[in-house]
């Protein structure tokens, strides 16, 4: 089996389905409305393609049941690979399967046979949710970085307080003035201050 790629246009979709006819017709229809699609006929094909370091797809659309590997297994792998967003396709619409797919992080669930007219808005909704989640993760990372920087600056100030027997405000001013003189960022000087103490204590 091979992985096929359509010309680059809009959002990048990785389609994974063992039914070649469904895969081809779905890809052609999505290409026709501006999506860029890559197709894989098995979980193994999809995993190999992802392992080759290709550009991160905006959304993976995968079948639940496929010979040689479950789409749900691939879904777990996608979560490990930088939270690659995905939605599920299945001939089954039972509540248990839908609930399990949702628990695994599926952003949408569509039932076969595929109706392209219904699939397109489902994909659009999944892409919108994926963008929202990405923004939330980015904001959380920025917040965590800010908290980490604040902690490290506070540690550096504490070191200066001990070394120079200064109060906190005076120690912070000294750290800030030193950063200006050395033309470096406050956080970089804080890291250097902490590292110097850690080196001495080795």
List the predicted regions and their residue ranges.
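C-terminal output helix
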Residues: 96, 114-123
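Conserved acidic segment of CheY-like receiver
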Residues: 7-22, 26-30, 60
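Short amphipathic alpha-helix used as the core "switch/output" element in two-component signaling
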Residues: 47-48, 72-83
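Acidic catalytic/metal-coordinating carboxylates
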Residues: 41-42, 68-73
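Acidic, metal-coordinating helix/loop segments flanking the phosphotransfer/catalytic sites
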Residues: 39-59
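Active-site residues of response regulator receiver
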Residues: 62-63, 90
